[in-house]
Regions:
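Short amphipathic alpha-helical/adjacent loop interface patches that line ligand
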Residues: 30, 125, 171
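Residue-level detector of anion-binding/catalytic polar loops
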Residues: 77, 131, 181
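Short secondary-structure boundary/capping segments
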Residues: 43-44, 68, 92-97, 181-182
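A short coil-to-beta-strand element that immediately follows conserved catalytic motifs
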Residues: 46-47, 133, 184-186
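Helical element adjacent to the flavin cofactor pocket in flavoenzyme catalytic cores
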Residues: 35, 62-74, 86, 94-162
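Dinucleotide-binding Rossmann-like beta1-alpha1 core, especially the glycine-rich loop
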Residues: 1-84
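Central helical "cap/lid" subdomain
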Residues: 143, 149-186
């Protein structure tokens, strides 16, 4: 069943629709990240100089640029860079310039130290009343109608107003305990 669904989503129209949805979510997430960073004054070696995606072959760069056209339609700034422009943007690549066919630059993207970010965001969350539970195995989602009202763990029952299920391919296993089927597979 999953395989057929996957193949159905390989069509051009489905790809465009899915890319739009994923990009909209990514842009919303980036806006929320920026808001939280500003409100909480988080310090995590934030780098707002964009993202440089480097290519060794023109074929793979062309494939990325085809997708980038859709990104541009949705408001994402994308710049195609020649090998020379790539080296100007990142001089450390000059030693391997003969192996680079160019790059795609996303000036609106940003990065930072993930460890520092998680430490900072955790501290900010604790100040707002969040309680973290570590070394607890989640065994079951307790459902009441359309709402998850608790999680059964080896540390006891954890109740809450809202839950975020973020376990990657393991999400579907835990979701199944509440009769929720997620099309996520390893």
């Amino acid at each position: 069943r999953w395989g057929l669904s996957f193949l159905a989503n390989c069509r051009e129209a489905a790809w465009r629709e899915n890319t739009r949805a994923i990009l909209a979510l990514a842009l919303d997430s980036l806006a929320e990240l920026r808001r939280i960073v500003d409100v909480e004054n988080l310090s995590y070696d934030r780098n707002q100089t964009g993202l440089l995606k480097i290519f060794r072959s023109s074929g793979s760069m062309e494939a990325t640029l085809r997708a980038a056209k859709l990104y541009e339609e949705l408001g994402v700034s994308v710049k195609r860079l020649t090998t020379k422009e790539t080296i100007e943007k990142e001089p450390a690549l000059s030693a391997i310039s003969d192996k680079i066919s160019g790059a795609v630059f996303y000036p609106g993207d940003e990065s930072g130290d993930a460890f520092k970010f998680t430490q900072e965001i955790s501290a900010a969350a604790i100040k707002r009343g969040v309680e973290f539970k570590f070394n607890c195995d989640m065994n079951e989602l307790i459902r009441n109608g359309d709402k998850i009202e608790a999680v059964k763990t080896n540390c006891g029952l954890i109740s809450g107003d809202a839950f975020i299920l973020s376990l990657g391919s393991y999400s579907s296993i835990l979701a199944k305990t509440a009769n929720v089927m997620l099309p996520i597979y390893p």
